[in-house]
């Protein structure tokens, strides 16, 4: 149930193509993989950075969760997701420790990732991710 790594860092953006070009130029990233994320009504682009992913999220709809976040907070850092070996066990441990989470359980992320939003810590939205069912490249 230990944390395994920084799984991914999300940035919320208005224009996905513009953001990809900017992140590639400024950070020297090779390329982004663009993926539809229908359960969040967003389009995402991800690029590998060491053992982690840098993810850009562009809402398709202002009423989606990412759309509401963008409207309230503007573009920029969105969330930090930490990898775990067993998400369901970790959520059960948090519950038994009396720690409330945003999500009642895990939900589907992109590419077979299982995720759960655990709320904000000192202003940063935090999430846990279990990608043990995903292909190792995912």
Regions found by a protein language model. Name each.
Residues 5-7, 26-41, 60-78, 93-115:
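A cross-kingdom feature marking solvent-exposed beta-strand/loop segments within repeated
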């Amino acid at each position: 149930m230990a944390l395994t790594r920084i799984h991914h860092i999300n940035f919320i953006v208005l224009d996905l193509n513009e953001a990809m070009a900017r992140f590639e130029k400024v950070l020297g990233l090779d390329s982004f993989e663009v993926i539809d994320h229908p359960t969040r009504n967003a389009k995402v682009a991800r690029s590998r950075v060491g053992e982690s992913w840098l993810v850009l999220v562009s809402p398709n709809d202002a009423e989606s969760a990412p759309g509401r976040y963008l409207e309230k907070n503007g573009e920029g850092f969105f969330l930090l997701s930490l990898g775990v070996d067993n998400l369901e066990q970790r959520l059960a441990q948090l519950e038994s420790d009396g720690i409330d989470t945003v999500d009642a359980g895990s939900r589907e992320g992109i590419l077979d990732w299982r995720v759960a939003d655990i709320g904000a810590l000192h202003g940063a939205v935090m999430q846990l991710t279990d990608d043990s069912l995903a292909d190792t490249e995912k």
